Each structure stands twice: as C-alpha cells, then as structure tokens.
Regions:
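Asparagine-centered polar/low-complexity signal
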Residues: 61, 111, 131-133
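Generic structural signal for beta-strand residues in well-ordered domains
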Residues: 62-64, 98-100, 168
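Conserved AMP-binding/adenylate-forming core of the ANL superfamily
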Residues: 46-50, 67-112, 116-120, 137-142
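Flexible, non-catalytic linker and terminal segments flanking ANL/adenylate-forming cores
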Residues: 1-51
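Structural core segment of the AMP-binding/adenylate-forming
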Residues: 2-23, 96-97, 124-180
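AMP-dependent adenylate-forming
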Residues: 30-34, 39, 56-79
C-alpha cells in the first residue's frame, strides 16, 4: 500500500533558505520580516500583561507611535494619532445621543479605515460592539439586530439598502451612514 507521504515533492524550509535575500538582522526562516522593516512595523510582539485591556494596548500605542501609520487600506492610511482623535470623537458622539455604557452598537462594515475608528470609538464609550457581516441579507441583518438588541448602527453606504429594508423592525434608534 502506498501512502501520500511517500510521494511528496515538497521542498523543506531549510532547503529554501538560500533562495531568499539575506539581511543580517532578519532570520532566514522569516523572510516576510523584510517588508515589516520597509513599513516601519515591529518584527516582534510585546505581549501585554494578562490583565491589560484592549483600550490600554491602544493607549500605549497612541503614545508610542503617534504619527506612524496604524492602518493602510486602498491607498489611504490612518495614523495612530488620527485613530486616537477620531475614535474619541465617535465615543463622544455616541454619548451625546444618550446611549449608555453597556448599550449595543452594530457596525456593518468591511475591512476599511472607518472600521477601526468606529470600533474603537464604541469601546471607548463603554458600549458593546456588535459586528455585522456587511454581506448579510436583510433577513439575516434583522435577526442579528433583534438578537443583539443594538440601539445604533454604523453602516457603509454601499450596504445601507439592506438596513433600509429592516429599519422599522428592530430597536435601532440611531443610524450613521459612512462613506468610503
């Protein structure tokens, strides 16, 4: 009997080492780190203490990285400083709507620069982030909004039609439509 493992033609990582350019401070078994250097990204991760909150991690990074890019998407970037400022504005806006700590806020967005701003703003306001798949049908969206009890929703304009079909069927009182 022949097994698949007897017929592999795979090259082991140790055999590939010679095919990558060598950089004195980049291990040859991790060639992707070269691109990290190009973009000024850390090549190692400093693990926070077990009791560190996500907000504490962001606060530390705001202070540490300021004007450096936090996110890059479709040719645009968002610095840590801008993320800090804009997410604080979102948090203040949510509070100005009368929403309270613990209220649920739905966010129906793909991976775009608006997402981290809104997500962090929701968390900073002490509210609960409800991620919503932007590809949901109106029936799926209605179910998630009802199930979560979301009182507000941030939605990219491309997906607003889906929400329009269910807007009168749930507890959502505040709708923020974002442009790309």
């Amino acid at each position: 009997m022949t097994t698949a493992s007897n017929h592999t033609n795979q090259t082991s990582p140790s055999e590939l080492h010679g095919t990558f350019p060598t950089y004195p401070d980049i291990p040859s078994d991790r060639p992707w780190l070269e691109s990290y250097e190009r973009y000024g990204l850390a090549s190692s991760i400093e693990k926070p203490a077990d009791d560190t909150s996500l907000l504490e991690v962001f606060e530390r990074n705001f202070a540490r990285y300021g004007n450096r890019d936090a996110y890059i998407c479709m040719g645009s970037s968002l610095s840590y400083r801008d993320l800090d400022t804009r997410s604080r504005q979102i948090a203040a806006y949510l509070q100005s709507l009368g929403l309270k700590v613990g209220d649920k806020v739905a966010v129906m967005m793909p991976n775009v620069l608006q997402y981290p701003v809104v997500a962090l703003g929701v968390l900073r306001a002490g509210m609960i982030l409800v991620n919503v798949n932007p590809l949901y049908t109106s029936r799926e969206l209605e179910h998630q909004l009802h199930d979560s009890g979301a009182k507000a929703i941030f939605i990219i304009e491309n997906f607003a039609k889906t929400f329009e079909e269910v807007k009168d069927k749930g507890d959502v009182k505040h709708v923020v439509v974002c442009s790309m």
